[in-house]
Structure formats: C-alpha cells, structure tokens
Amino acid sequence: MSTAVINADDDAMEPTLQSILDQRSLRWIFVGGKGGVGKTTTSCSLAIQLAKVRRSVLLISTDPAHNLSDAFSQKFGKDARKVDGFENLFAMEIDPNGSMQDLLAGQAEGEGAEGLGGMGGMMQDLALSIPGIDEAMSFAEVLKQVKSLSYETIIFDTAPTGHTLRFLQFPSVLEKALKKISQLSSQFGGVLNGLLGANGALPNGQNLGEMMEKLEALRATISEVNQQFKDERLTTFVCVCIPEFLSLYETERMIQELASYQIDTHCIVVNQLLFPKPGSDCEQCTARRRMQKKYLDQIEELYDEFNVVKMPLLVEEVRGKEKLEKFSEMLVKPFVPPS
C-alpha cells in the first residue's frame, strides 16, 4: 500500500487527498464507486488540484452517462480537448461500447473495416468471440491517445462499480485477444496471403502483415500498461461513497476486488455529509446526521489505514469551473463545519 500522509498529533491518516498530489510517481488514477455518489465531481476536482502540481493532466470519462461535459459546462468528445480556463488540463469522453470494428477501421487508413470484405468479417467475428472484447476496445482507443500525447497523469472517471471493475480487467482481456489473433496469423498467414494475392493485400489495399504488426505493437503496449496498473507507485484507485448502507457495501466489495487485481487503493472520499448547526430544530437533519454518523464510524473503523476525506452536502449543485475549484479545495484542506 502506498505511503500516505500521517497526522502526527493523533497518529491517524490525514483526511485529505494530499498524499496523491505528493506522490509524484503516480501516472494512473481511477475514481469510482456506486452510481450517484459524486464520482464525476470528485474526479474533476482531483484533476483540478493535480493540474496545479503536474506538467499535464488528462481526465477521461468511461461512464456511458458522460458527465464531464455537464460538470465543466463544456462539450467534450472522444478526442482530448483542453478544459477552458486551464493550460495543462485536458478531458475526453470515450464510448465504453466501442467495438473491434473501430480498431480494424483505425488500423486501415482507407475504407475502414467494411472495406475488408469477407476477410474483415472473419477477423471481426474472431475477435468478438472473446468475452469482454467489445467493451475493451474503448480502452485500446485510450491507450492510443495517451501514448501519442504523453500526459504526466491520467485520471479515469469510471462508470458505476460493476462496470468499473470490468474496465480494470480490459488490459488482460485485450492482451489475450490480440495474442490469439497474432498466433492465428502466424499459423495461417501464408494461407491467407495466398488467398489474398501475391502482395497479401486486403481489399482496401492494406497489407495483412502490416496490420498484424500493428496489432502486435498494441498488444505489447497493453501488456506494459497492465503491469503498470499493478504497481502501487504508478497506479491508485480513489473510492467515492456516501454514508449509507448500500454505498458502504459496494465500497467494501470494490476494495476487496481491487485487492484481488493487485490494484492499490488507500483513499476514500465520503460525500454528502450533513453538518446541522448546533441548536438546529430540523428533526430530519438531526435524524439523518445520526444515521450518517453510524456509517461514517464504520468506515473509519474498517479503513483506519486509509485517507478518509469527509465532504459536506452542499446547497448548490457543483457545476462550472469556479464551483469545482472551490469543491476541490476541500479535497486537500479538511472541511471545518460551521460552529
């Protein structure tokens, strides 16, 4: 587990994400949790703080809802775009339902996958027969952009819990898929080239050997990234939750699965905390605060070796650069409830 900031006064973990900012070696940061707990707000805010201390930061949404555009009040797409008001913060929203057809189209500069004719269909059918490959192709698109643009830190605003954990398996899925395709190409490449003609050209003019070389290069990149995900110096996962039973249950399940994937996690952000003013006569507020405190106590007991960040429930929605910047400050400076 990564070294985190210690509060010398009480020997407790610092209740901020400052340890992530201080860990200069981090390259991949995942932010995830149950739906509706504030993942996007947290990931955007963390990206803003990281942009202050990193050369370049890329924020990627893999959530089908694509809330980055809403959070920053700026339209993002599948290509990285600079976030308005920042010089070194970029964002993109990728389609988690990308397909092998996209990859084949990307390998060919001409007519795309449709131009491969029956051979392209065979390659696509072969690739899609591997479980999880269809979703995993979005990850290949990310790798292609990240490798060419060399960002210092990449933050993933992930989909709700189940999709997040599948996404973290994608490097392994892609690696197996591309390895299988490469093996089949080695075994039957001669036969295919014979069928295609003397120069081994596909119907769109691309050489089969060239395409397989590109696939193999992609496989090598995926293998490298897969190793980086398991290195606590390079990768960490920030869990986001709210102080309720289902969210706490999902967080525990996610932490257990992350451990099984050998992915580091040592930070939990607890959003939507109520802090009723002393003497408040709001019975609902007091009752809800009592319930929240019960689950917050459980979180602090279960994860005493984690940085647990307590974020207040705000009156207004956190949207736009100014509000996100204000929210982001509370990730590195503990929120002090009004007395």
From Swiss-Prot:
Recorded GO MF terms: ATP binding; ATP hydrolysis activity; metal ion binding
Any Pfam family the entry gives:
ArsA_ATPase
Q: What are the binding positions for Zn(2+) in this chain?
A: C282, C285
* Active site (record annotation): D63
List, alphabetically, the GO terms of the cellular component aspect: GET complex
- Give the enzyme's EC designation: 3.6.-.-
* Ligand binding (ATP): K34, G35, G36, V37, G38, K39, T40, T41, E244, N271
User: Per its UniProt record, what InterPro entries does this chain match?
Assistant: Anion-transp_ATPase-like_dom (IPR025723), ATPase_ArsA/GET3 (IPR016300), ATPase_ArsA/GET3_euk (IPR027542), P-loop_NTPase (IPR027417)
Q: Where does this polypeptide localize?
A: Cytoplasm; Endoplasmic reticulum
**UniProt keywords, alphabetically:** ATP-binding, Cytoplasm, Endoplasmic reticulum, Hydrolase, Metal-binding, Nucleotide-binding, Transport, Zinc
**Coiled coil regions, renumbered to chain:** none
Which GO biological process entries does UniProt record here? tail-anchored membrane protein insertion into ER membrane
Q: Which domain of life is it from?
A: Eukaryota
On whether Metal-binding is a keyword of this UniProt record, the answer is yes
Q: Spell out the family assignment given in the record's similarity comment.
A: Belongs to the arsA ATPase family.
Q: Which PANTHER family match?
A: ARSENICAL PUMP-DRIVING ATPASE ARSENITE-TRANSLOCATING ATPASE, ATPASE GET3
Subunit details: Homodimer.
* Primary role: ATPase required for the post-translational delivery of tail-anchored (TA) proteins to the endoplasmic reticulum. Recognizes and selectively binds the transmembrane domain of TA proteins in the cytosol. This complex then targets to the endoplasmic reticulum by membrane-bound receptors, where the tail-anchored protein is released for insertion. This process is regulated by ATP binding and hydrolysis. ATP binding drives the homodimer towards the closed dimer state, facilitating recognition of newly synthesized TA membrane proteins. ATP hydrolysis is required for insertion.
Can you name this protein? ATPase GET3
Instruction: State the species of origin.
Output: Podospora anserina (strain S / ATCC MYA-4624 / DSM 980 / FGSC 10383)
